[in-house]
Swiss-Prot record:
<feature type="coiled-coil region">
    <location>
        <begin position="152"/>
        <end position="177"/>
    </location>
</feature>
<feature type="region of interest" description="Disordered">
    <location>
        <begin position="172"/>
        <end position="209"/>
    </location>
</feature>
<keyword id="KW-0175">Coiled coil</keyword>
<protein>
    <recommendedName>
        <fullName>Tumor suppressor candidate gene 1 protein</fullName>
    </recommendedName>
</protein>
<feature type="compositionally biased region" description="Gly residues">
    <location>
        <begin position="14"/>
        <end position="47"/>
    </location>
</feature>
<feature type="compositionally biased region" description="Basic and acidic residues">
    <location>
        <begin position="125"/>
        <end position="149"/>
    </location>
</feature>
<feature type="coiled-coil region">
    <location>
        <begin position="70"/>
        <end position="114"/>
    </location>
</feature>
<feature type="modified residue" description="Phosphoserine">
    <location>
        <position position="150"/>
    </location>
</feature>
<keyword id="KW-0597">Phosphoprotein</keyword>
<feature type="region of interest" description="Disordered">
    <location>
        <begin position="111"/>
        <end position="157"/>
    </location>
</feature>
<feature type="region of interest" description="Disordered">
    <location>
        <begin position="1"/>
        <end position="55"/>
    </location>
</feature>
<dbReference type="InterPro" id="IPR043450">
    <property type="entry name" value="CCDC89-like"/>
</dbReference>
<feature type="compositionally biased region" description="Basic and acidic residues">
    <location>
        <begin position="174"/>
        <end position="188"/>
    </location>
</feature>
Amino acid sequence: MWRMRGGATRRGSCCGGDGAADGRGPGRSGRARGGGSPSGGGGGVGWRGRADGARQQLEERFADLAASHLEAIRARDEWDRQNARLRQENARLRLENRRLKRENRSLFRQALRLPGEGGNGTPAEARRVPEEASTNRRARDSGREDEPGSPRALRARLEKLEAMYRRALLQLHLEQRGPRPSGDKEEQPLQEPDSGLRSRDSEPSGPWL
């Protein structure tokens, strides 16, 4: 009895499943057939046709990006060339600067060691100028010794004035002491300054101021 019920149950479920499948089948097939043309027209364009405009835009953008990339590459290459050229120029200028410094040092040392045989003769001239100045100064000093305002003339005049001052003091002292009968002793002191004055006057002296 249980076997009969189980068989009937299996048969009923199978029949019901077939009916449901039959009920669902036409609807799906209808939707599948009608989905191709949702607008109702039979000659519509598919998704591949609708993507043509976007593809063209992508191609244009890709071309622009490629051109920009090439321009950037050219600018970088130009910058690299300029940088290399500037580096070479900098290295050349450094070498030139070092060479000039060495030449300057060598010339300076040569001028210090051999002042008379220098390249331009500047050290020899620099040493010759003070010597000429000292020689001229000595010549001027020797020539001015005989002038009225020279130290030699002033010294001679000072000595002459000192001798006259001593004579005046001696004469004043004798006058204060009074006259004496023996004039030999008085004349002897008076002659001493005269002899000194004459010896000093014999030297060349300048005129009076």
